[in-house]
From Swiss-Prot:
Protein name (database record): Tigerinin-1
Endpoints of the signal sequence: none
Disulphide linkage map: C2-C10
Location in or out of the cell: Secreted
GO terms for biological process, alphabetical: defense response to bacterium; defense response to fungus; killing of cells of another organism
Function description: Antibacterial activity against B.subtilis, E.coli, S.aureus, M.luteus, P.putida and S.cerevisiae.
Naturally occurring in which organism (per UniProt): Hoplobatrachus tigerinus
Key words of the record: Amidation, Amphibian defense peptide, Antibiotic, Antimicrobial, Disulfide bond, Fungicide, Secreted
Keyword Hydrolase: no
GO cellular component: extracellular region
Tissue and organ distribution: Expressed by the skin glands.
Positions carrying Tyrosine amide: Y11
Length: 11
């Protein structure tokens, strides 16, 4: 999944 908080990244 990807997140923008606290930094943009995908796992």
């Amino acid at each position: 999944f990807c997140t923008m908080i606290p930094i943009p990244r995908c796992y």
